[in-house]
């Protein structure tokens, strides 16, 4: 059964949908679409990770869910349930932040892909919304590729880089900053409180954010790293569209990989 036809029958979405949600299927339906030609997309976004005083802990999860919907509408893929925990050691000083050990974050994706590959699929794509997550994803790719399972992931630093450079006005930043806040103003403005947005940028050669100016790392009392006060919806739209096009190209490139 074709993915597109099963997507319509299984979920009855209000919009044209090319892909399907694995969670909406029975195992009998899943067996029909989990074939060697299938690309399985696994969204990844933290649902409990600090993003300054103006963005929610669920920020990355909301972002992952947004891109998941866009991919479902545009790509012939099977989308697995969103993974909402991973490797975020840079933010552990801020309450509400959760992180997995590197090995756990790596092995979670290895295990998910191995389990689904038993039934046919050999190509998997992590729809990644984090920076520190790329390390365990790269390690997972090494393990899986050695087993003949192709695994790709979004390099979030590169995906929207050109668009970011074109619109960004901040001195620097990478977290809960001008760009990330702009993205959220575009995809989920209700989750942003611009009255609490701040500029908090203290570069450091040491990785990770810290609430203590005497500790190694980039000092940030707010948990932000950059200038969120410069964020606009229009900037967010430009970056989101650039990231989406990169993700779609990544998926099609993976589909063509032997």
Where are these regions (language model features)?
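Extended, histidine- and acidic-residue-enriched regions that form the cofactor-binding/catalytic faces
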Residues: 14-103, 107-125, 129-258
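Cleavable N-terminal signal peptides
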Residues: 2-4, 14
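Alpha-helical interaction segments
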Residues: 4-6, 215
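N-terminal signal peptide c-region/cleavage motif recognized by signal peptidases
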Residues: 9-11
